[in-house]
Design a protein with these regions (language model features):
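Amphipathic alpha-helical transducer elements in NTP-driven molecular machines
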Residues: 53-64, 86, 131-138
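ATP-dependent NMP and nucleoside kinases share a basic, alpha-helical "lid"
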Residues: 37, 41-42, 71, 83-126, ...
Length: 170
């Protein structure tokens, strides 16, 4: 299908839940998943376990290497990440052109901030994201709309309608 779906929204917006509820795990790359593969949750300064971001360079390089291998085979791929910064969205352009992919942003930025914060509080404790971080990321979506416009932005329902049941056997 040669399609790349970039999920975009604040932590707690429901991106991973969307993937799980639609049985898309086998088609999904997630920096959070790679982070926990590289390092188990660690105790922070507050005495709570959390996922470390100290390996993010390695995590994103690994994600991009796996993505390229999938794109070489023409696979449909979902990236489950916040994509709150323009640089993150732009990092896919080279591969999109090289492998002649269609790319879409699956928009979760319409989820209210309060809902994101509530969902975050209901996560396993080690997966919590500090509320201040969520608020900062949420504010970034307003300022990076112009970059997101380089990609076609689609709703979650539009995304599901686009999936070809023959090429995505789920």
């Amino acid at each position: 299908m040669r399609t790349l779906f970039l999920l975009r929204g604040a932590p707690g917006a429901g991106k991973s839940t969307f993937i799980r509820n639609n049985n898309l795990e086998n088609y999904t790359l997630s920096p959070d998943m790679i982070r926990t593969m590289v390092q188990c949750p660690v105790m922070n300064t507050k005495g709570e376990y959390s996922i470390s971001c100290h390996n993010d360079g390695y995590v994103w390089n690994t994600l991009m290497e796996i993505l390229e291998r999938k794109m070489q085979r023409g696979e449909t791929v979902f990236i489950d990440a916040t994509h709150y910064r323009a640089a993150l969205l732009n990092s896919y352009n080279k591969l999109i052109k090289k492998y002649r992919y269609r790319a879409f942003i699956v928009d979760f930025t319409d989820i209210p901030l309060e809902q994101c914060l509530k969902n975050n509080r209901n996560r396993d404790r080690y997966k919590w994201v500090p509320e201040e971080t969520i608020r900062k990321m949420y504010a970034c979506f307003t300022y990076s709309k112009e970059v997101a416009c380089k990609f076609k932005i689609i709703s979650r329902d539009e995304c599901i309608k686009m999936l070809d049941p023959i090429s995505c056997l789920f």
